[in-house]
Amino acid sequence: MGQTVTTPLSLTLDHWKDVQCIASNQSVDVKRRRWVTFCSVEWPSFDVGWPLDGTFNLDIILQVKSKVTCPGPHGHPDQVPYIVTWEALVYHPPPWVKPFVSPKPFPLSTLPFSPPGPSAHPPSRSDLYTALIPSKPPKSRVLPPNGGPLIDLLTENLPNLPPLSKGPVKKRRPPPPRYSPPNPMESRVRGRRDPPAADSTSSQAFPLRMGGDGQLQYWPFSSSDLYNWKNNNPSFSEDPGKLTALIESVLTTHQPTWDDCQQLLGTLLTGEEKQRVLLEARKAVRGNDGRPTQLPNEVNSAFPLERPDWNYSTPEGRNHLVLYRQLLLAGLHNAGRSPTNLAKVKRITQGPNESPSAFLERLKEAYRRYTPYDPEDPGQETNVSMSFIWQSAPDIGRKLERLEDLKSKTLGDLVREAEKIFNKRETPEEREERIRRETEEKEERRRAEDEQREKERDRRRHREMSKFLATVVTGQRQDRQGGERRRPQLDEDQCAYCKEKGHWAKDCPKKPRGPRGPRPQTSLLTLGD
């Protein structure tokens, strides 16, 4: 028999075109990325039982829908199209969803008189679904001989469980189930072995549950439960928060005994991890004064390392088990905390396509894991808010820093503002268009600047040429004017010095006589000078 593990989330992603058609029929539009984010990050944080891998349980879907459509600041209107589409998948399931949707139970009164046919699929409440390729076993005769009356094992009173006062607790194996399990995960919800009553609203999926005669009956973990829990979750060292949440849900819903807790820890944790968890749990034991105690008798009484003789049939034994589970959870939380390392908290930054809510959850998880501080503590809200602003995406962080009256803003206010900024981000197509437009504008400005510089250069060259031409023309005009002013012609007996007639210049009485002074010598510059 071959099998492949799938989940409601992966199932919807494999049939994404069908999901979009269903959303279109609801007059809404859904995006694949936000579908995954809401299913695996947002809705599990509502604390209504929504698993990380999605579910087709209508009750859980309606609880998430009530949270999403809540009026006022606590609502999430951007998530309405997605939860409405989830709801439509259950109300009008396509063929690939029908095997995983809970059918309406048949009345028990009609069962004793009808021969049992092929095993019907019981309501599926598991986080994971396994698609099996069933083999066809040979049919065997299941009716009593001679047409005798059928006995409904589900309504028959179970045998009394003798009260246990001392000695080891004896585990009783369950009677043969009425339904054959459709997948290995079925035994996670043990209520499938008993069809729910019409007026029943509480789950019966407990290892310890009330039998027909008022006695508690014990149903141990199945190997398929432990196998799937171990293989579908990260190790405690890799992600202590996720594994702690799984164990917490198992302790809450299954109400395991001391032996079950040891089996659970031995399967999901390594030997070193288990010892660390047990040590932290024993440190959390409190004395009569409400303070942590180290008295061996009180520690061993509340959290024993050896198998105790607690009788789950008595109120005292059940109280011991409740306290033991609480201490075990405290040990898991304390052991999951790493040494204080604020540098690792600062490395948590918002991804390019990560929503602010998802980023805040990762940031809080880093605070829980790498610091001793509780991010939910009101006294730490300022530190978490500053980390949220500084480590957000650059465009979101810049706008958050410019908010008016930033000091009075709560962490919830900052997340809402960041969501608005995130939702108004441009799409990749818009970003490409903006970059193309900016490039064209930049190129246009560059061409205009080049043309302006060329025009300025031409004007400067024209001015220089005009000056040069003006100089040449002026020189030519002066030369022409100078050529016209020639010396006047002298007569034969006219003096060139005094311009009088009757003598020449050398005999001019008006010309000064006497020795000539030395001519001034013109100094020449040499290369040395």
Swiss-Prot record:
One of its GO terms (molecular function) is structural constituent of virion. Residues 116-211, 425-529 are annotated as: Disordered. Disulfide bonds: none annotated. Residues 157-167 have a biased composition (Low complexity). One of its GO terms (cellular component) is membrane. A zinc finger (CCHC-type) spans 493-510. Residues 429-467 form a coiled coil. It comes from the Viruses. It holds the Pfam family Gag_p30. Residues 187-196, 425-457, 477-490, 498-510 have a biased composition (Basic and acidic residues). Gene3D superfamilies: Gamma-retroviral matrix domain, Human Immunodeficiency Virus Type 1 Capsid Protein, Zinc finger, CCHC-type. A lipid is attached at G2 (N-myristoyl glycine). GO terms for biological process: virion assembly. A motif (PPXY motif) lies at residues 176-179. The record marks Y129, T130, F206, P207, L469, A470 as: Cleavage. Keywords: Capsid protein, Coiled coil, Host cell membrane, Host membrane, Lipoprotein, Membrane, Metal-binding, Myristate, Phosphoprotein, RNA-binding, Viral matrix protein, Viral nucleoprotein, Virion, Zinc, Zinc-finger. This is Gag polyprotein. It comes from Duplan murine leukemia virus. The gene is gag.
